[in-house]
Amino acid sequence: MNRIDRRFDDLKKEGKKALITFITAGDPDIDTTYDIVLALEEAGADIIELGIPYSDPLADGPTIQASSQRALAKGIKIKDIMDLVMRIREKSDIPIVYLVYYNSVFKYGIEKFLEDSKNAGVDGLIIPDLPLEERKEVLDVADKYEIYLIPLVAPTSKERIKGITENGKGFVYCVTLTGVTGAREEITTDLEEYMRLVSSYTSMPKALGFGISGPEMARKLKSLSDGIVVGSAIVERIAKGYNRCEMLKEVKEFVLSLREVL
């Protein structure tokens, strides 16, 4: 059984929601990313979403774009991130999902990317800009290596939700708003109607993300989904430039505050 399925099954039995935490791999550096992942797990994260830095991340807001640029400026390569996951796997069995742009996968080679991801211990991929027409090719290779291609749907893609969720695995990443990522004070999309629509097409667990800024918002949204994705609000804390110990402490405290409400 894939680690993602196992985690959602366990959470369901416990009556809890999944806390999915996003960070950019290599920001501020690979060794610190390793420490952050272990700190996130310790604080109660259920799934780690590792962003592979990309020079033109269309779905990302300024916080994650800046994070990507910092990692790229350090010369981070996909191979470094594969090695990082291998290191994490020596210590942890937490589900790990890459958030990666299609061009990065294509340039690396679809088959090689999925084979290396499997060997490293990756459980799933989210490819936010994957064209629907390329989906089958990636899906076939992902299935071969038993890696889940996690569908990402948005409120604007109603007519495409069926096509995007078809054959998806793991969970559906439901974007709460149109536009780019980033912590917000409030979310104005009619989420109840949106989540009903997604549920009409798939019985997979659904996680809400994009714009979730803290525990108050997570508390309000948890009844609508099976999990919450928090990214920019964590990346902001990593970027503050504290010394390593202070930063890890603040990230852990923030994630603990999210875990408590879920």
UniProtKB/Swiss-Prot annotation:
Disulfide bridges in this chain: none
Gene Ontology cellular component annotations, sorted alphabetically: cytosol
Subunit organization: Tetramer of two alpha and two beta chains.
Single Gene Ontology MF annotation: tryptophan synthase activity
Lineage, broadest ranks: Bacteria, Bacillati, Bacillota, Clostridia, Thermoanaerobacterales
Protein task: The alpha subunit is responsible for the aldol cleavage of indoleglycerol phosphate to indole and glyceraldehyde 3-phosphate.
EC number, UniProt record: 4.2.1.20
Keywords linked to the UniProt accession: Amino-acid biosynthesis, Aromatic amino acid biosynthesis, Lyase, Tryptophan biosynthesis
Pathway: Amino-acid biosynthesis; L-tryptophan biosynthesis; L-tryptophan from chorismate: step 5/5
Protein known as: Tryptophan synthase alpha chain
Active-site positions on this chain: 49, 60
CDD domains (alphabetical): Tryptophan_synthase_alpha
Reactions mediated catalytically: (1S,2R)-1-C-(indol-3-yl)glycerol 3-phosphate + L-serine = D-glyceraldehyde 3-phosphate + L-tryptophan + H2O
Top-level taxon in the UniProt lineage: Bacteria
Gene (name only): trpA
Family the entry assigns: Belongs to the TrpA family.
InterPro entries on file: Aldolase_TIM, RibuloseP-bd_barrel, Trp_synthase_alpha_AS, Trp_synthase_suA
A Pfam family annotated for this UniProt entry: Trp_syntA
EC class: lyase
